[in-house]
Amino acid sequence: LSMNSGGSSQIPTIYLEDSARDQIAAIATLTTESEYGEVAGLIGTFNIEVERKQVDAFNVVSLMKGSDPELANEVIVYSAHYDHLGVGRDGNIYNGADDNASGSSALIEIAEAFAEGSAPPRSILILHVSGEEKGLLGSRWFVEHNPLPEQMKLVADINLDMIGRNNPTQIGITPSPEHEHWSSLNEAAADACEEEGLEPTYDVDSFYGRTDSYNFAKQGIPAIFLFAGVHEDYHRVSDESDKINFTKAAAVSRVAFRLGWHLAWAKQPPVRKSPNSETGNR
């Protein structure tokens, strides 16, 4: 039996493991699955003690100002959340190697790559956000209280979350060509994938609203989410670094760098397009 706060929900949620379910069913003299599977109107009463603690969390932001006097006011954002689940009741630490040390470390590598060269025309912002696991809180605060100078405009977000597992030659991309938020940003991402020998897949739209890029998209900012998919260690203490495919994570990082570099030099910032099923078959 475990209790979860339900992310940003204020309603505690109870999850019953099979063993707990069977014990409750046995108390009700229901001894087989066929019996308790047919019962209607069985009511259970639970007393739950919830201790809430409010803490301060911080976004970490770094900005490389663009070299063009006008285009420098157009900002390409790289985002990744650095928070995870902390310490469990049993004292085990949820290190979150894939979720999301993989994405947050990729941002550090991308920042170093940009720093090694001359600044591109548009500005580059590296955004490590907190509070993702509690309901995308850090990214929501950032887009609602944009701390940049007033003249600077966010024109794209490239979000990396869980990029180090599953198929070594594929990376999930959302929004897909059939999604209402499909944009020229996604087309450029497909080209970057080809340059790095990765196949983009478009079967992860169900996760579009579950990561930080969604808060940018809600503000009308073209956004893309690079995501290798969930696995058996998702939100478990077993999500450790020895299971990361570092070669794949590095390739996805290079895809993201190429994409941002292209956007920073493009004549026009990315724009949303109508869903295009033909592009999805590329």
Model-based region annotation:
Residues 75-79, 121-130, 156-158, 272-275:
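Beta-strand segments within the central parallel beta-sheet cores of soluble alpha/beta enzyme folds
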Residues 97-110:
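Active-site alpha-helical elements of protease catalytic centers
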Residues 2-96, 112, 116, 121, ...:
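Soluble metallo-hydrolase cores and metallopeptidase-like ectodomains found primarily
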Residues 16, 112, 116, 232-282:
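His/Asp/Glu-rich mid-to-C-terminal helical/loop segments that flank catalytic regions of hydrolases
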Residues 122, 198-206, 267-275:
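Surface-exposed patches in mature extracellular/periplasmic domains of secreted proteins
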Residues 2-4, 9-29, 119, 129-231:
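Metal-dependent peptidase/peptidase-like ectodomains
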Residues 87-94, 168-171, 236-239:
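Short acidic, glycine/proline-rich loop/turn micro-motifs
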